[in-house]
Swiss-Prot record:
Belongs to the class I-like SAM-binding methyltransferase superfamily. RNA methyltransferase RlmE family. RlmM subfamily. Keywords: Cytoplasm, Methyltransferase, rRNA processing, S-adenosyl-L-methionine, Transferase. NCBIfam families: PRK11760.1 (NF008734). It catalyses: cytidine(2498) in 23S rRNA + S-adenosyl-L-methionine = 2'-O-methylcytidine(2498) in 23S rRNA + S-adenosyl-L-homocysteine + H(+). The gene is rlmM. This is Ribosomal RNA large subunit methyltransferase M. It is found in: Cytoplasm. It comes from Salmonella arizonae (strain ATCC BAA-731 / CDC346-86 / RSK2980). The keyword rRNA processing applies. GO terms for cellular component: cytoplasm.
Amino acid sequence: MNKVVLLCRPGFEKECAAEITDKAGKRELFGFARVKENTGYVIYECYQPEDGEKLISELPFSSLIFARQWFVVGELLQHLPPEDRITPIVGMLQGVVEKGGELRVEVADTNESKELMKFCRKFTVPLRAALRDAGVLTHYETPKRPVVHVFFIAPGCCYTGYSLAHNHSPFYMGIPRLKFPSDAPSRSTLKLEEALHVFIPEDEWDERLANGMYAVDLGACPGGWTYQLVKRNMWVYSVDNGPMAQSLMDTGQVTWLREDGFRYRPNRNNISWMVCDMVEKPAKVTALMAQWLVNGWCRETIFNLKLPMKKRYEEVSHNLAYLQAQLDEHGVNAQIQARQLYHDREEVTVHVRRLWAAVGGRRDER
């Protein structure tokens, strides 16, 4: 199998294509990207027959910024007969996947696909039963086996394939299903909540998002991101000249500092988290984040980079490379991840975790 489907935000197909072409090429898995604007997906076609499977195995999915999900597929199945769509799909998957742990019948995240989504939901149950009978799926769901994907691009027209359990998005269509909390001050709260789900393994939440931690929110007004930290029982310094929501102030967990986020310097050395969603040029935000990390002012950070209208992949890559260079220069070992989240628009969200550093007073780094 030589094709990989990558799901992305509609309107960002070119960025997704540029990224996969660049990163696959660096691993000598050469190919070309098929792109149609505003379709919400890209197909990367490798020149060598088995390179699609190699790509989803060797390139860490966590290293991709613009892809929400990916899976390797065979040829496009077209003109599926309405009276029996199941038989051709089962035939395509037999011999390709054995004992898959889960079935996902998906579409791209576009308005045009909403009707198709209703069909996918109904179609999943009989298709799952047929795939189990054929040995393509196990008789019970298991997260340790490959996930079988059936991706409809139009009625009667789909790609079939699989993703690897250890190297994909665990979410259907790559989108965590989150509900907006009615007491949150703004919808931006969902960005940070999604980032926590995407970047931090659930079994590490109790340790890395623990009660009683200290956190800083730069550019906090009115408090959408502060809300997520307060909800996890942290003590939060919310830095912004604009006012914070009274509901957050009433918790007693928030200290509002009327300062410019770019000028603020913390006065304590046990800050676990710094978050930042300021509308500013990406280079300026990246430089500020580098300063916080190099000086050991926080252990982990999540921040947003607003994207320009053109060369968006290049802009993000340039800023992440600058951040990595600053950390390397100052002997800071850190893990950097970036993703355009479902709740992001013209922006990407970056997570950095300091693992250890040669900064005095921070011997607790691990």
